[in-house]
Amino acid sequence: MNRTKIVLATSNKGKVKEMADVLSAFGFEVIAQSEFGLVSPPETGLTFVENALLKARYASKMTGLPAIADDSGLAVDALAGAPGLYSARYAGIEDDDTANRRKLLAEMQNVPDGQRAAKFVSCIVMLKHETDPTPKIAFGECFGEILREERGQNGFGYDALFFYPAKQCTFAELDSTEKKQISHRALALVALQKQL
């Protein structure tokens, strides 16, 4: 089978691991942007869509390949949707998962049980080329709640704090195969596949 090469526009190793197998099953030969020596551009957009488009356009421009990018985050009801767009740098340092979780726990300290609802949101964008005027855009959401302490060793980001009621565990307590089937990113990838 002739597989289409596509650059995965993320520097997040957790996202690469989570997305590459799924995209490969869709018939793509996935090449992480790190293999080209690229890092993601600054996320200056005001929405998940804008940030995903920025990343995909940059990766496509720099590699000459079609690109796929994800922008995702955790939106907590009691925090008016925060950390939201700033999930990866919530504590002020890019991709410091431990610091981000600590800050979230500190901000949620006085939020009572029953008012700790949250959702993971993923926006995935696919471009055929840098100036593609009709990008494919897909969304996925997973609903849960924020625990008072971390549980589980798997995953990344806020997974150890995100309790998923449908499985009665945190995302960090799921094995990678199970998470790839039910996560917000998995749901967005399935929605994207329907557009291909």
Swiss-Prot record:
Coiled coil: none annotated. PANTHER family: INOSINE TRIPHOSPHATE PYROPHOSPHATASE, INOSINE TRIPHOSPHATE PYROPHOSPHATASE/HAM1 PROTEIN. Its EC number is 3.6.1.66. This is dITP/XTP pyrophosphatase. Its cofactor is Mg(2+). GO terms for cellular component: cytosol. Substrate binds at T10, S11, N12, K13, G14, K15, S72, F156, G157, Y158, D159, K179, H184, R185. It is an enzyme of class 3 (hydrolase). InterPro entries: dITP/XTP_pyrophosphatase, ITPase-like_fam, RdgB/HAM1. GO terms for molecular function: dITP diphosphatase activity; ITP diphosphatase activity; metal ion binding; nucleotide binding; ribonucleoside triphosphate phosphatase activity; XTP diphosphatase activity. The active site is at D71 (proton acceptor). GO terms for biological process: nucleotide metabolic process; purine nucleoside triphosphate catabolic process. It comes from Haemophilus ducreyi (strain 35000HP / ATCC 700724). Homodimer. Mg(2+) binds at D71.
